[in-house]
Amino acid sequence: MKRITDPRSGYYHKNGRGVTAYESFVPQPLQHIVINVEDKGHNGQEPALLALADKALEHLKAKDAEGKEMTEEIAESSVRLEWNVPSMVLLSLGDETEKKKRDIDQQNMVRAIRYGIDCLERLPLSGRLLKDLHWVAMQGEHNEKKYPGEFRTSPIWMGDEHDTLESAPFIPPAPDDMLKAFYDLEQYINADDDVHPLIKAALIHYQFEVIHPFIDGNGRGGQLLTLLFLNERGILKGAAVNLPRVFHLRQFPYFTGLASVEISGTYEKWVRFFLEALMVA
């Protein structure tokens, strides 16, 4: 399959040789991405990104001041979003079996959110912490073969059950490239820079999902990372905003928005979607 990508977002790297060769996407480090904060959308009539980010920041602080605790709601929305990913292949084991799995995943996610927020008081937001949270989130017999708490050491691809490394519409970074990309992301997360924190949160969320460091559970991992980043930056104090619910309600623009960055380099379009989602979370 011929893969089209914009050099602003990254490039495709050829791995292996002969019949086992495949191409995987390598994202540009976020340190290289400069967002046009005056971008006003495709029609030039929408609020500038920086103004929208400031407005979203006010909204989040107001929500946080309400003091609501939404851990269970966030967990439920995160699991629903990941289970509803179009490319996910669900086992045909009947509704009751699937519901039991979702219930286990939801309970695990509640524990992971609470553990993560507690850990921020003594640990930096890092790959080590995310691995620990992934281990908590991926408990249960149905997750045993998904390497809980470990970064993947094999290629994965996004597609349906008929796709292969050759035909899949998207292939995240190969293991070596993934480790380098995650290291760059970790440095970006903890860098002392002048990027607006909510614009930075949008970029971090995108980058984590495109890196896809785990065999499974990356959707929940991305939601955890976003929530913890907002806490680490002092924007939230706990689980006060259910952003995964908005993503779940707007699944199509959420997933196409992530994909469009790779294809066309439209980071600004993704950032706008993310900020607008925060405004209604």
For each of these PLM feature ranges, what is it?
Residues M1-A281:
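FIC/Doc superfamily catalytic core
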